[in-house]
Amino acid sequence: MAMWKKKKTPSILPLVVVIAAASLIAPTTAGWSSGTATFYGGSDASGTMGGACGYGNLYWSGYGTNTAALSSALFNDGASCGQCYQIACDHQAEPRWCLQGRTVTITGTNLCPPNYALSSNDGGWCNPPRTHFDMAEPAWLQIGIYKAGIVPVLYQRVPCVKQGGVRFTMGGFNYFELVLISNVAGSGSIQSVWVKGPNTDRMPLSRNWGANWQSHAGLVGQTLTFGVTSTGGQTLVFQNIVPAWWKFGQSFSSNLQFSY
């Protein structure tokens, strides 16, 4: 991968260039942070399917190709799954490889694991405490030049926009149910979940891995209601979203969606 180095900016610039640069400088004073980005998954992003959040086929689950694997500093042991980030290639730092004035909004769907065998500045891009996005190639190409390999970026967390309602996918087995909660708008990520059935008192679920929440109750054969609180602090109750005839592997979409 090509390396990037910060270049000196000429002291005298045409007015049009100064105006363009201002749009890139402004994010650093408005809650933007600095990081780096690479890409993976091929031109159709088929290599990004699955992943440490558990969303499976990202085409089918609504996440598409504007996705990224997050370094562990961002991934937060899976608590950041589903969060959305607006990313701009830092054209001031690396004008050779950045598309000026472009941004892309991605969803965190995977973990970019650390590689301690490599230096954090030479291949170990996802080593902590680096904030790094290993982006799906189609997302990367909206802000950077293919042969760059790695570029400096500016990023900020933004609200997620999704089509349709929150989706619940039932996995695991009886007395060890795994509930995948996906297609979450607003803050994109989940803080807490509870479940209640006609034969089961309301009980909290715990995060097992990624966006999968677990229950040790026998939920088979029950109509299930879920209460979900987003990391933005909004709580929605999905009344009887899962019918009594549900089977493991089935997904159920709601008509409710988070706004924050």
UniProtKB/Swiss-Prot annotation:
Superkingdom, natural source: Eukaryota
One cellular-component annotation, GO: membrane
Expression sites by tissue: Expressed in roots.
Keyword field: Cell wall, Cell wall biogenesis/degradation, Membrane, Secreted, Signal
InterPro entries membership: Expan_Lol_pI (IPR007118), Expansin (IPR002963), Expansin/allergen_DPBB_dom (IPR007112), Expansin_CBD (IPR007117), Expansin_CBD_sf (IPR036749), RlpA-like_DPBB (IPR009009), RlpA-like_sf (IPR036908)
Residue ranges annotated for the Expansin-like CBD domain, each copy included: 175-254
Domain Expansin-like EG45, chain residue ranges per copy: 50-165
Membrane topology field: Peripheral membrane protein
Signal peptide: 1-30
Subcellular location: Secreted, Cell wall; Membrane
PANTHER family: EXPANSIN-A15
Family of the protein in this entry: Belongs to the expansin family. Expansin A subfamily.
Described purpose of this protein according to its UniProt entry: May cause loosening and extension of plant cell walls by disrupting non-covalent bonding between cellulose microfibrils and matrix glucans. No enzymatic activity has been found. May be required for rapid internodal elongation in deepwater rice during submergence.
Protein name as annotated: Expansin-A15
Organism placement in taxonomy: Eukaryota, Viridiplantae, Streptophyta, Embryophyta, Tracheophyta
Gene name, Swiss-Prot/TrEMBL: EXPA15
